[in-house]
Amino acid sequence: MDAFKGGMSLERLPEGLRPPPPPPHDMGPSFHLARTADPREPLENSASESSDADLPDKERGGEAKVPEDGGAGSAGCGSAEDPAKKKKQRRQRTHFTSQQLQELEATFQRNRYPDMSMREEIAVWTNLTEPRVRVWFKNRRAKWRKRERNQQLDLCKGGYVPQFSGLVQPYEDVYAAAGYSYNNWAAKSLAPAPLSTKSFTFFNSMSPLSSQSMFSAPSSISSMTMPSSMGPGSVPGMPNSGLNNINNLTGSSLNSAMSPGACPYGTPASPYSVYRDTCNSSLASLRLKSKQHSSFGYGGLQGPASGLNACQYNS
């Protein structure tokens, strides 16, 4: 209140009686406030300048937006043009008439790869364009190659495979036909099959009569080995009785050797009868030669095994 009253009294005083203003150093706070307020002005000015400077940017942004709008408009035009382009790029299906197809097929049978001039001629004949004719020939060649490939596959499946399938048998069928199995190897190794049960096609095809006819009786052997002009008594230095004894001995021994009951190996129809016949014939010929030698000068000497038959020799 005192300060307010003092202020009021100073204002009521005339100008001449008013006290002088305070010294400048007392105005520091006011100047300081003014100084503090001064830096704000540039800030405000800078803000205004920045806002003013932003205006061209905004204008530029607006100007930039115009191309964006224009770009959007162009994009819209492009989007509007895309379906048109798609419609242009989309191929329309060509429907050929029967006359056109006949002409094209006839030309394809003559030439599968027509050149440009020939395609143009075909296009003129069929009232088609050259690209249509070219595409038709391309598709027709692809269809023809596919048909040829399928025919070759059918021939391979239907013709050649059955011919070879009859010749080649699976492994299981071969083993089954031969009588083998995968589980009886141990049984076969422990219990071998007898000789008479084995099958040999070559020897089984030979009958016992043919095997016996191969090796004839001693009389026939003696007649074959001796000339026809030489009879039993024509041998010099050898009596007829000695030759008769030789024939009797060799005939009895050979008959006993070739008889089925004399040998315990099996019937003459067995595949090993040929081998036994060869052994018997060789032994019989050896005994015949020994008898002949003994009759010529060694009649008193006779081996201990001269009375044995062929089977006893084999044993």
Curated annotation (Swiss-Prot):
OAR, short sequence motif: residues: 281-294
Bias-annotated ranges (Basic and acidic residues): 55-68
Residue runs in coiled coils: none
Alphabetical UniProt keywords: Acetylation, Activator, Developmental protein, DNA-binding, Homeobox, Nucleus, Phosphoprotein, Transcription, Transcription regulation
Residues covered by region (Interaction with PIT-1): 149-280
GO molecular function, one term: sequence-specific double-stranded DNA binding
Region (Disordered) location: 1-103
One of the protein's GO biological processes: hindlimb morphogenesis
A Pfam family per the record: Homeodomain
Subcellular location per the Swiss-Prot or TrEMBL entry: Nucleus
Motif (Nuclear localization signal): 287-291
Pro residues bias spans: 17-26
Keyword DNA-binding belongs to the record: yes
Annotated DNA-binding residue span(s): 89-148
Modification N-acetylmethionine occurs at: M1
tRNA processing among keywords: no
GO cellular component, one term: transcription regulator complex
Biased composition (Basic residues): 85-94
Phosphoserine: residues carrying this PTM: S46, S48
Stated role: Sequence-specific transcription factor that binds gene promoters and activates their transcription. May play a role in the development of anterior structures, and in particular, the brain and facies and in specifying the identity or structure of hindlimb.
Quaternary organization: Interacts with POU1F1.
Family note: Belongs to the paired homeobox family. Bicoid subfamily.
Name of the molecule in the record: Pituitary homeobox 1
Organism (species): Rattus norvegicus (Rat)
